[in-house]
């Protein structure tokens, strides 16, 4: 996971105020919120010195979820993991949008977004995919949202998502 632009600025300040253990705990919470029952198995946050702005922020982490698959009579359903719902300025700003009708514009002062790619290696343990969610593409003046899911060679389930808030003011 990389933090760039406004996310770099915001999260760099946040991470610089945390101890290494508190940083790990932050990502443990993200994993638990994103994949209930998930356990963080590996973690690395770079750069070690958050004041080193010559390097972008990169979080590398692995996690495990036991009994994650939902078995059915003839099929198995896999809940998808979406880290974009738990990290990033766009997520924070969307959470504040909540009105159906606005008397005054919602000013964010920034355009921002998140790009997510998640790979789950299942090999041939689950058999052939019977169905996948349809790809989504919404693109208008204020926002872009694209999502897709596919199965690639060797039994890798790939989920890709891009969300962009393209303007700093919404009416």
Predicted regions and their residues:
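A sensor for short, sequence-defined functional sites
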Residues: 1-171
């Amino acid at each position: 996971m990389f933090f760039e632009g406004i996310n770099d600025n915001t999260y760099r300040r946040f991470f610089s105020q945390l101890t290494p253990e508190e940083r790990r705990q932050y990502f443990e919470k993200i994993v638990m919120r994103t994949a209930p029952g998930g356990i963080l198995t590996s973690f690395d946050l770079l750069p070690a010195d958050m004041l080193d702005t010559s390097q972008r922020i990169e979080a590398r982490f692995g996690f495990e979820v036991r009994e994650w698959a939902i078995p059915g009579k003839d099929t198995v359903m896999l809940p998808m993991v979406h880290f974009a719902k738990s990290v990033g300025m766009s997520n924070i700003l969307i959470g504040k949008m909540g009105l159906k009708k606005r008397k005054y514009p919602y000013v964010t002062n920034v355009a921002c977004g998140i790009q997510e790619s998640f790979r789950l290696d299942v090999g041939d343990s689950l058999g052939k995919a019977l169905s996948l969610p349809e790809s989504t593409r919404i693109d208008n003046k204020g926002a872009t949202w694209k999502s897709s899911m596919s199965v690639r060679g060797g039994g890798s389930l790939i989920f890709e998502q891009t969300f962009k808030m393209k303007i700093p003011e919404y009416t």
